Amino acid sequence: MTRSLKKNPFVANNFLGKIEKLNMREEKEIIITWSRASTIIPTMIGHTIAIHNGKDHLPIYITDRMVGHKLGEFAPTLTFKGHARNDNRSRR
């Protein structure tokens, strides 16, 4: 279900404050965040954000095509290591 258009997109307050401070100073540095539910807004374009995937922080460079998506979409939490082999010896 999508978010109502009457509401603004969700962005964590402390995370939004960090972005605004960097934009005022016109600096680019990596911002570490655990807020995977935050929506990418146009003020974030050009920043590198390290998004937590449950184990590490993955640095993601924000581009204009990412606006409107959630931060968590770009930091996968699961690593697929393949299906189990069909080992007939273990069945005996």
UniProtKB/Swiss-Prot annotation:
Query: Primary place of residence?
Result: plastid
So which domain of life are we looking at?
Eukaryota
Which GO terms of the cellular component aspect does the record hold?
chloroplast; mitochondrial small ribosomal subunit
InterPro entries the record matches: Ribosomal_uS19 (IPR002222), Ribosomal_uS19_bac-type (IPR005732), Ribosomal_uS19_CS (IPR020934), Ribosomal_uS19_SF (IPR023575)
Q: Where in the cell is it found?
A: Plastid, Chloroplast
Gene3D superfamilies documented for this protein: 30s Ribosomal Protein S19, Chain A
Q: Which GO terms describe its molecular function?
A: rRNA binding; structural constituent of ribosome
**UniProt KW keywords:** Chloroplast, Plastid, Ribonucleoprotein, Ribosomal protein, RNA-binding, rRNA-binding
One GO biological process term is: translation
Its annotated function is as follows: Protein S19 forms a complex with S13 that binds strongly to the 16S ribosomal RNA.
Tell me the HAMAP family matching this sequence: Ribosomal_uS19 (MF_00531)
Q: Which family does it belong to?
A: Belongs to the universal ribosomal protein uS19 family.
Query: What's the protein name?
Result: Small ribosomal subunit protein uS19c
